[in-house]
Regions:
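Non-catalytic, surface beta->alpha helical segment in thiol-disulfide oxidoreductase systems
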Residues: 77-102
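Structural micro-motif
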Residues: 65-74
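CheY-like receiver
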Residues: 12, 61-64, 97
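A short beta-strand-turn-helix
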Residues: 2-19, 59
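Structural signal for short hydrophobic segments within the conserved structured cores
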Residues: 2, 51, 82-85
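Conserved redox-active cysteine motifs that mediate thiol-disulfide chemistry
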Residues: 24-38
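Thiol-based oxidoreductase modules, predominantly thioredoxin-like and allied folds used
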Residues: 4, 24, 39, 43, ...
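Short, conserved catalytic or interaction motifs in soluble domains
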Residues: 34, 44, 78
Length: 102
């Protein structure tokens, strides 16, 4: 799962014509550590892009999207934010939310 910085975010997320999941997380966050393997597993199974943003390394992105808790997963479609999932999420929940965007 590729970690994006501010410069890469616009290209990989906002200019993407498909569905993109962005996981805003932090290295010190326990639930984030539990979420990461689920997202890595999903990445090999799905037809949409999954990226991560470290809120400590990219605080401007966290601020831009008002990330107040981690993990926060944001779903974008054609560059527009469509949904935010806050806290640890089961794989099935993530897939259900993505299906709603198709």
């Amino acid at each position: 799962m590729k970690e994006l910085n501010t410069q890469e975010f616009d290209t990989h997320v906002l200019e993407n014509e498909g569905i993109v999941l962005v996981d805003f997380s932090a290295t010190w966050c326990g639930p984030c550590k539990m979420q990461k393997p689920i997202l890595e597993e999903l990445e090999s199974e799905v037809d949409f892009d999954i990226y991560s943003v470290d809120v400590d390394r990219s605080p401007e992105l966290a601020g831009r999207y008002n990330v107040n808790a981690v993990p926060s997963m944001m779903l974008f479609k054609k560059g527009t934010l469509k949904n935010t999932l806050v806290g640890f999420q089961a794989k099935e929940v993530i897939l259900e939310e993505v299906e709603k965007l198709k």
